[in-house]
């Protein structure tokens, strides 16, 4: 629950902790299970109000869940690092669909453009999966072209490996 997270953050701040890193499998959907709606923007506002916390970093924000409201909070709250770990996994529409992702190349480009327009100094990190079953040389080249065009500041690339319960 949010109150427990806020209490833990307050306790950490009182112990001298300066940075909070919010990380979950899908950080951007925080609150859906408990409150039946996304609560990350509210949580961020409330964490930023805690004295002693200097900066907050967000990890694992899937692009399809990054909302204009979240971007606005990141823009307004000075304690939130202009750094976003946004795992896109691939950029080929065909492979994204096979992976079960809920986005496509155009939506990825639109989201990145929105982030860079609203937060010009944002640092974007992403992770990619290569060798996904059925990936062709054309899919791979498309991904290389996408990465070159976007110019991510940080990039992690991993070979496909089967993981129970997920296609990717």
What is the predicted role of each segment?
Residues 146-168:
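Conserved glycine-bearing catalytic or ligand-binding loops at nucleotide- and phosphate-handling centers
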Residues 9, 43-44, 155:
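Metal-dependent enolase-superfamily TIM-barrel catalytic cores that perform enediolate-based chemistry
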Residues 6-7, 23, 148, 156:
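Short, surface-exposed helix/turn micro-motifs that flank interaction/cofactor sites
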Residues 12-13, 147:
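Hydrophobic pocket-lining residues that define ligand/cofactor binding sites across diverse proteins
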Residues 13-140:
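Conserved SAM/AdoMet-binding glycine-rich loop
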Residues 1-3:
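Canonical Radical SAM [4Fe-4S] cluster-binding loop centered on the CxxxCxxC motif
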